[in-house]
Amino acid sequence: MANRKIVVALGGNAILSKDASAEAQQAALRETAKSLVSLVKENEKLIITHGNGPQVGNLLLQQMIGSTKSNPAMPIDTAVSMTEGSIGYWMQNAMDDVLEDEGIDKSAATVVTQVEVDANDSAFQNPSKPIGPFYEKEDINKIRELHPEYIYVEDAGRGYRRVVPSPKPVNVREYQVINSLVDNNVIPISVGGGGVPVVREGNHLIGCEAVIDKDFASEKLAELIKADLLIILTAVDNVYINFNKPDQKKLENVTVEELENYINENQFAKGSMLPKVQAAINFVNNGCGEAVVTSLKNINNFLQKGSGTIITK
């Protein structure tokens, strides 16, 4: 089944390990590119999306520490675009090198992507997405003097973290550009970190203080470009029920209805596996094709043996 249009969503944590240096992240992405090129070898049309959770948190911390009246910190939408550019550069450089090594006549290109959200989304009244580092309570009081608009919540006894809105994506502004790149034998890298969050004001798109979940944004892109397959990569080869319990069970071929029942049983952790499963359900329900949740190292096994968690109607 070659020549399929396949969106592959990479997690931000797959890019950043314990070493947050640019060199270490580039090295990690070179290994990622070696795994992804197997899809290209099978004559599939690859579209890469990625997270930026650790990276944008680190960048916002740098911005805050260095902020002055004459050189103020950049807002979240701009920080997201900055990480889209940096991670996209690393990813396309790694992909181009691997494609060259394999003798494949293709190249990669990064698209800084604006993802539209609804200005009336209830998420704007209920910030819930944690970003950045953990703080002690006394540190929060100092930060609030400089940024009274920031909202911090306690996170499971580990300290306090800033939370921001995480609205659902309703459109990907550049999806036609991305489709055009695919049609011209280019591997697009887009929707980095869920894309730059924008809201519509009349005929204009305006950046907003939010972070869009990259799995939902990847699904919206896959839907708009009429992808045949959405692959959401995570740390494990399969989705599990009763995860990390003696009776844990991996899911291999599963229907949307079965997954929805598992969601009702609270089988999937919020902020971890749950959004991946929900994004996969959305894609399949929209009649686009199948969705797969698996790990990067399992890509070859998925291609050859169909292993991983495969979601169908």
Swiss-Prot record:
Keywords: Arginine metabolism, ATP-binding, Cytoplasm, Kinase, Nucleotide-binding, Transferase. It catalyses: hydrogencarbonate + NH4(+) + ATP = carbamoyl phosphate + ADP + H2O + H(+). One of its GO terms (molecular function) is carbamate kinase activity. Its EC number is 2.7.2.2. It is an enzyme of class 2 (transferase). One of its GO terms (biological process) is arginine deiminase pathway. SUPFAM superfamilies: Carbamate kinase-like (SSF53633). One of its GO terms (cellular component) is cytosol. It is found in: Cytoplasm. Pathway: Metabolic intermediate metabolism; carbamoyl phosphate degradation; CO(2) and NH(3) from carbamoyl phosphate: step 1/1. Pfam families: AA_kinase. The keyword RNA-binding does not apply. Coiled coil: none annotated. PANTHER family: CARBAMATE KINASE, CARBAMATE KINASE-RELATED. NCBIfam families: arcC (TIGR00746), PRK12352.1 (NF009007). Belongs to the carbamate kinase family. This is Carbamate kinase. The gene is arcC.
